[in-house]
Amino acid sequence: MANILFIGVGTMGYPMATNLIKNKHNLNFYDPYAIEKNIKNLKSLGCIKIESLKNIPNNLDFVITMLPTGKEVKEVTIGNHGIVNYTKDNFIYIDMSTILPKDSIEISQQLKKKGISMLDAPVARLVQNAIDGTLLILVGGEKEEYDLSTSMLKCMGSDVVYCGTSGSGSKMKIINNYMSILLNIITAETLALADSSGINRDLAIELMSTTAAGKGHMNLTYPAKVFKNDISPGFKNSLALKDLRL
């Protein structure tokens, strides 16, 4: 059972905080923009709302942030009114927001000067996964702090993955999102093309699910060839270009 300050109890942060409470952790929370329903529910579960970071509790094991951008994360950590100015505890700080890796690294370096260790641990998957406690959590930072935090993080995520040194969690999240977003766009365009071409959509989906188009080159072509250092052409660029022009 850990003593935790959770900063940011919005769409994702609220269910994440709730799962920590359900797993018997002691929780204080801070969010001046939280909706009244979330505040009321958290209080009913025994959480304490702090009105200012000046009132940061003593004897914390973890401080967790789940905020919209790096600007807000910096403000509540290393800003003029951030936690670094109001505590002497040697807690582990965990940022679960999706922010620039350079911001994660900068915050980590500044906190380290004050004796505070940091993990960047952005989450993947959907709001329902946050509710169910089945998020994917991608962690960057020192391995020792990761090991100390894993059991607590597993209250919020079914898959907790150590990605490497400071900033690695943020980098992996952005890389994953980059591929996921592009694949989503391509999928929508492909199905729209099938519709406009008069091809039955169910047929197109069934067919493409058996090829690299649906299964993904990451699962087929790359393990079979590229990851084995075999980069010999399997399909000429000129032929690929010809097909795209059709």
Please identify what each model-predicted range represents.
Residues M1-N58, F62-T65, F91:
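NAD(P)+-binding Rossmann beta1-loop-alpha1 motif at the extreme N-terminus of oxidoreductases
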Residues I4, I99-Y178:
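Rossmann-fold dinucleotide-binding core
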Residues L53-M118:
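Rossmann-fold NAD(P) dinucleotide-binding segment
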Residues G167-L193, K236-D243:
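Mid-domain beta-loop-alpha active-site segment that forms a flexible
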Residues S170, H217-L246:
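Interdomain hinge/lid region at the active-site interface
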Residues I199-A212:
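Small-residue-rich helix-loop
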